[in-house]
Every structure is written in C-alpha cells, then in structure tokens.
C-alpha cells in the first residue's frame, strides 16, 4: 500500500504523463460496471470512501460517479456490481449522499478545483495536503487517512502570507496562517 508521499508522487506523475489539456479532460473513476464497487473494495469503510470521493472531486479531470455510489451501494464482482438502483430512499445512506452533493457543489463553485495547478505541499504517513492554484486563487485540500485526529501544522509560507485566513468549505472550523504554518484541528 502507498503512504501519502508515494500517493502524492504517483498522482503528480500521472498528471505529467499527458499534456495539460488532456489531463484536465480525463475521466476520473473510482469504480465502474467492470469492477467491484469502491465501497465494497474498502470493506464498507465509509471514511475511506469519503476521502476517495473528496480526492476525486478535487483532482484535475472530470469526476465520474458510478450510479449508486452517492447513496452507498455495495457490490462485489459481477453481477453484484451492476445491481439495479434502489429507488426506495429508506435504503439510501443520506449522510453519504449529502457528502457527495457537498463535494460536487464545492468543485462546481470553484474554478481552481477544475482547472488549477495541482501541487502536493505536505505528505507524511497517511496525511496529505494538496494546493490547487489558478490566476491568484489558491485552495488547500487536506486528507487524513489516519485513525486519529490531526492537528494540521504545515509550512505553507511559500504559498500564502502570514495572517491569511482559511475557510473550511466542507463545514468545519477555519484556520489561520501564523509564522508560516497553517494550524487547524
């Protein structure tokens, strides 16, 4: 398995293989009708699924959501992965659906997430921070795949001025850059 450093290196390499315009148009899938559903591959781990969804929505290219992922459909090998959509809303994971909606809304609302440069600025253990920037607009995306809470303390002085205030677009508390370090719980 990859740690955050290996993951950051590999995702950056994938972007460098193709011309920029091609990378921005690539179809980004977590799963499809030809493979087990992602949620099944991670044994129903919804936190891993949420992180993968956030990554999919913030990585360059066009995110493609396989039907049912947004409500937590499971499915291993064929034909389980091609089960019909469960229209009975009582069977849906509404929290997961709201997560998908929030991530998609944030992506749609911020051009920088669709066409900005992709720069890993922190990768240690199972924690990763990506900088997306475009025409003076900069956004940080933090991923914590560890089981413990993370007090973010990362040097980002090369990208932001001291005193810069950050808003958490996914509903958490904001953060402030102090002495060249971003600190957030």
Regions found by a protein language model. Give the residues of each.
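Alpha-amylase-like alpha-glycosidases and glucanotransferases acting on alpha-linked glucans and related
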Residues: 1-63, 113, 122-125
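Carbohydrate-interacting/catalytic domains
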Residues: 44-49, 60-65, 69-185
């Amino acid at each position: 398995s990859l740690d955050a450093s290996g993951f950051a290196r590999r995702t950056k390499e994938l972007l460098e293989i193709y011309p920029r315009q091609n990378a921005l148009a690539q179809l980004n899938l977590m799963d499809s009708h030809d493979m087990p559903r992602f949620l099944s591959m991670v044994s129903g781990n919804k936190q891993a699924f949420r992180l993968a969804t956030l990554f999919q929505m913030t990585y360059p290219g066009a995110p493609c959501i396989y039907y049912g992922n947004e409500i937590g459909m499971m499915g291993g090998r064929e034909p389980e992965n091609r089960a019909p959509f469960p229209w009975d809303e009582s069977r849906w994971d509404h929290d997961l659906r709201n997560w998908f909606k929030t991530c998609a809304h944030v992506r749609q609302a911020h051009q920088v997430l669709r066409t900005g440069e992709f720069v890993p600025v922190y990768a240690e253990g199972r924690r990763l921070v990506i900088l997306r920037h475009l025409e003076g607009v900069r956004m940080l995306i933090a991923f914590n795949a560890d089981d413990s809470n993370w007090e973010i303390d990362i040097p980002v002085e090369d990208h932001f001025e001291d005193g810069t205030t950050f808003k958490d677009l996914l509903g958490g508390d904001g953060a402030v850059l102090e002495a060249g370090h971003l600190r957030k719980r």
